[in-house]
């Protein structure tokens, strides 16, 4: 099966178009947010697994569905929704979500927010065996190993030049047993940062043997104009 959700740069309506038809082929797409998501049940050798698909949420979206709830922040909004879809503690559960979890490392590629207003508390996800997160470009865990951003497969700005992209593989064993591994995703053309004088950087010896088809961000240290 394939599971997909809409993120903060997506149109939830467009992503969800044809979702009912796709579900017949085991391609599950998050619908437009209309309330807490129902689990998608699967079964493997260890028993049932519930998959929850939660698209990117803003407080206004949740207030519209639950007008009687006191929702002032992103954490309030997410908490309101997750309380209504709390997983069965006797069953294994996976949540796919797209939020900025407090404590995660961001970079310039992500959409900035003032004062971290869009941060949510990692503790909100505690009931799930694994939380597959999107939104941040750097692969990383947040707090526990099973609360993880897979990161983007490619680098989208030079602020990501030193990131090591990877694919995350998750294996669910019996309840409480989760095994994680990663595989590197080396780019065909990397992003690299160079710093030095014009003469240093144009000397053939400085780039001999390097990948000359990479994308470069160059900082010249010359104190005089280069003719």
Can you say where each PLM-predicted feature lies in the sequence?
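Extended recognition/assembly regions associated with phosphoester-bond processing machinery
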Residues: 1-227
């Amino acid at each position: 099966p394939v599971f997909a959700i809409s993120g903060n740069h997506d149109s939830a309506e467009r992503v969800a178009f044809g979702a009912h038809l796709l579900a017949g082929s085991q391609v599950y797409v998050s619908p437009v947010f209309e309330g807490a998501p129902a689990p998608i049940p699967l079964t493997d050798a260890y028993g049932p697994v519930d998959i929850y698909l939660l698209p990117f949420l803003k407080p206004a979206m949740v207030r519209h569905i639950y007008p009687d709830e006191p929702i002032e922040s992103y954490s309030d909004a997410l908490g309101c929704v997750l309380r209504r879809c709390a997983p069965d503690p006797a069953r294994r559960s996976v949540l796919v979500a797209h939020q900025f979890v407090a404590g995660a490392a961001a970079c310039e590629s992500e959409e900035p927010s003032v004062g971290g207003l869009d941060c949510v508390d990692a503790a909100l996800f505690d009931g799930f065996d694994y939380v597959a997160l999107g939104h941040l470009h750097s692969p990383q865990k947040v707090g526990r190993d099973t609360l993880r951003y897979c990161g983007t497969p490619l680098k989208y700005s030079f602020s990501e030049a030193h990131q090591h992209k990877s694919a995350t593989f998750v294996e669910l064993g019996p309840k409480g047993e989760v095994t994680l591994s990663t595989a590197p995703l080396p780019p065909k053309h990397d992003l690299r940062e160079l710093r030095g004088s014009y003469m240093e950087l144009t000397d053939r010896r400085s780039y001999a043997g390097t990948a000359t088809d990479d994308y470069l961000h160059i900082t010249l240290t010359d104190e005089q104009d280069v003719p």
